[in-house]
Each structure stands twice: as C-alpha cells, then as structure tokens.
C-alpha cells in the first residue's frame, strides 16, 4: 500500500525521531501515544499544506490494532484532527491481527483491546478489517497479503469516489455523494460489497426476470448479509 505514496517529506512524516530514532516503539503503544503528542504538529502541518486539503470532505486514518506505533498514535491523532478541523468527520480503519500473532506475541491482544477502546471514544466511525478472515490456506504469505490488501481496497475505492464521477454514462439511477456517506458512517461500521458481471451483448428476451423473481433474489441477498 505504501508503494503508491510519494517519498517526499510532505507525504511520509517521520515521528519519534528524538525518542525512538524513528525505529518504532517495540509494540509499546503507551510510548507511541507520547510520540504522537510530541510530534502532532508535524502531521497537522503536512495535512494542512496538502494540495487538495480544502477539497476533502473527511479524514480516514488507518492503523494496525496489534502494533505499537499505529495503535498508540491513532486515537491521539484522531482527537487532535477533530479538534482542529471540527467541520470534517474523522474515520478510523483498524486492521485486526492474524491468529498466529495473538498466539505468539504477548502485547498483541492488549494493544488491540486498548486501541479499539480508545478510538471508539474519539472517531466518528470505526471500520474493522479482520486479517484472519481473509486468509487462504492454499496461498503463500505474499499472495495472502496481496489478496487481503485488494479485498480491503476494492470496496473503499467506490466509497471514496462517491459523487466524483462526471461522465453521464457511468452515473446510475441512484446517485450518492459525500453528504450521504457522512450521514451513513457512524460508530462501528460494516461495509457490504458485491458486484456482478454484465455481458456486453444482451440477447432480447433471453433470461428475462419478472419482478417476483427479482424480489426473491433480493431477499436471498439480504438473508445472506444478515447471516454473514
């Protein structure tokens, strides 16, 4: 994911240089919280000077719940950004640990619990990503990571592009914009996502469905979402 972020100082802000030398906090999230407080102005300045800052509708902060730097700093930064820019909601995407991390690393569960409790009190919405749920046993670790990242990013692409499409042929009957998203994302949030391939050439009257069949399919889909 970081490969697409520019490497200049405005896009990659190093925090904790004085306390940790920029080498992380060794899973000690309390230290990460201190680092975030000390260097918060560096991050806020980078946000404020961003090219499209005034066009943005909301903030999305992403962190791992099990690590030290992310889990300790994200509640601090969320609170600070909300105080500075109260007119824009701040969302948190929290990545939950793999099962083997919980079994082998002592601080994993503690950091995750502390992180979730902290962000719940400051973020406008929290979206959880369960790494373990996406794991495929027949995939290598590298392929698993790539697949998980793709599954996370795909639904977010459409969500973040809401209201941005300008070509009429891509605009559907029902249009969502940033205001609709802001009104919807509140508290603990789940994003349902689905897609269907549509043939380029459709034969008239072939496989046509009446409204009863469509209604049955909709109810099946709703039931499947409830069970999930």
Where are these regions (language model features)?
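Tubulin/FtsZ superfamily GTPase core signature
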Residues: 1-228
